[in-house]
Amino acid sequence: MYAIAFDLEISELKKHYGDPYNNAYFEVKSELEKIGFEWTQGSVYLSKDPRNNLATVYKAINLLSNIDWFKHSVRDIRAFKVEDWSDFTEIVKTS
């Protein structure tokens, strides 16, 4: 499984996206879901592609590169392979 994580500069996002700037995150989520990514937390998205290859990551990077406000606002963007994805939420909430 592959993931994408990014960080946006809020001052640049306000300048290039406008207000309410937080809608930009919903827009990214919607676009990435269309190509097989699932939002997990913050600005981290996991690929749901069963083929488990970098082609889906490439599609996502290409898609985000074509969003004008995104490319002007992104501070950092990374893609990485996830070997294991363990959800400890229930343990923490019921402790």
UniProtKB/Swiss-Prot annotation:
Its EC number is 3.1.-.-. Keywords: Hydrolase, Nuclease, Plasmid, Virulence. GO terms for molecular function: nuclease activity; RNA binding. Pfam families: CRISPR_Cas2. InterPro entries: VapD, Virulence_VapD/CRISPR_Cas2. It is an enzyme of class 3 (hydrolase). Gene3D superfamilies: 3.30.70.240. Cleaves ssRNA, mostly between U:A. This is Endoribonuclease VapD homolog. Belongs to the VapD ribonuclease family. The keyword Nuclease applies. Homodimer.
